[in-house]
């Protein structure tokens, strides 16, 4: 096979339907838009506008509250950390902090900190320093002979 022999699979690339090109095309005159009215013109309608009727987004009550100082943690699972330890990208003999986790490529960003969850198996004896961890993640690391130190004050209080 050569570059000049490459082709799309049959039916993969559909040809654009050219409209308003005479009655023989099947899409002549009104080009499949019907007759007159706002929808037959260019620009069509504004999303959410219901012709003067009170729109749905205004008929329903406002709900909820967004905390202005909410912390957003990057989630990392134990199984993924173990995978990086096995691959040699994280050194289990050294203390592992959030910067080491990001540098190894376990997660691309740490946002307001890293929260460790217990999904997956952990066999390496790790010393982790992170912003948060689930109770089951703390138990799993301690069972493997390691330890987790929590840096976020709220997370440290909730894990105890």
Curated annotation (Swiss-Prot):
<dbReference type="InterPro" id="IPR021131">
    <property type="entry name" value="Ribosomal_uL15/eL18"/>
</dbReference>
<dbReference type="GO" id="GO:0006412">
    <property type="term" value="P:translation"/>
</dbReference>
<dbReference type="InterPro" id="IPR030878">
    <property type="entry name" value="Ribosomal_uL15"/>
</dbReference>
<dbReference type="GO" id="GO:0015934">
    <property type="term" value="C:large ribosomal subunit"/>
</dbReference>
<dbReference type="GO" id="GO:0019843">
    <property type="term" value="F:rRNA binding"/>
</dbReference>
<dbReference type="InterPro" id="IPR005749">
    <property type="entry name" value="Ribosomal_uL15_bac-type"/>
</dbReference>
<comment type="function">
    <text>Binds to the 23S rRNA.</text>
</comment>
<feature type="compositionally biased region" description="Gly residues">
    <location>
        <begin position="23"/>
        <end position="35"/>
    </location>
</feature>
<dbReference type="GO" id="GO:0003735">
    <property type="term" value="F:structural constituent of ribosome"/>
</dbReference>
<dbReference type="InterPro" id="IPR001196">
    <property type="entry name" value="Ribosomal_uL15_CS"/>
</dbReference>
<feature type="region of interest" description="Disordered">
    <location>
        <begin position="1"/>
        <end position="51"/>
    </location>
</feature>
<keyword id="KW-0689">Ribosomal protein</keyword>
<comment type="subunit">
    <text>Part of the 50S ribosomal subunit.</text>
</comment>
<keyword id="KW-0699">rRNA-binding</keyword>
<feature type="compositionally biased region" description="Basic and acidic residues">
    <location>
        <begin position="1"/>
        <end position="13"/>
    </location>
</feature>
<protein>
    <recommendedName>
        <fullName>Large ribosomal subunit protein uL15</fullName>
    </recommendedName>
</protein>
<comment type="similarity">
    <text>Belongs to the universal ribosomal protein uL15 family.</text>
</comment>
<dbReference type="InterPro" id="IPR036227">
    <property type="entry name" value="Ribosomal_uL15/eL18_sf"/>
</dbReference>
<keyword id="KW-0694">RNA-binding</keyword>
<dbReference type="Pfam" id="PF00828">
    <property type="entry name" value="Ribosomal_L27A"/>
</dbReference>
<keyword id="KW-0687">Ribonucleoprotein</keyword>
